[in-house]
Amino acid sequence: MYKLRADGYSRAIAGESSGGICAFNAAWIMPEHFSRVHSAVGSFTSIQWHPENKQEGGDIYPFRVRKDPKRNIRVWMSDGSDDLENQFGSWPMQNIEMANSLKLREYDFHFRFGTAAHGGAQATLDLPESLAWLWRGYDPAKTSEEFTIDPVEKGKPFFRVTIANRDVW
């Protein structure tokens, strides 16, 4: 029998693509069970949006982060400029919007944005650093900690988009 900790402070959850939004969703709904989130190429898009059933999609999360009560979670996100664009939305744009929402509410978060496509390549490269970042300062004698935005991140501007494949005026 394994002896696992029951407190959210001692638990993390991770996922890639739909698993990335699932990991965030689990921590968002149950921060007392999961306080650390790794989301790689998270599908914060409208895949599950079904208006006839009044079912929201993941595209609503940036707005929920901005308007719902703040959760005590620490979040690592990564995505790339070559990620998916399809009928469900734009993975790069939605991840940028999520990062800006987390920043606006002063969550303890890190956003890595590169040139990767949809898949595990970036997540594989990031995993050692993301785990070290998510677990920094962990004290097994504690069962909770108030996560706050890193002062360096707080001093940085919001993420902005530059259009590189079209003429601009």
Write out the residue ranges for each language-model feature:
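Non-catalytic cap/lid and distal C-terminal segments of serine-dependent acyl enzymes
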Residues: 1-169
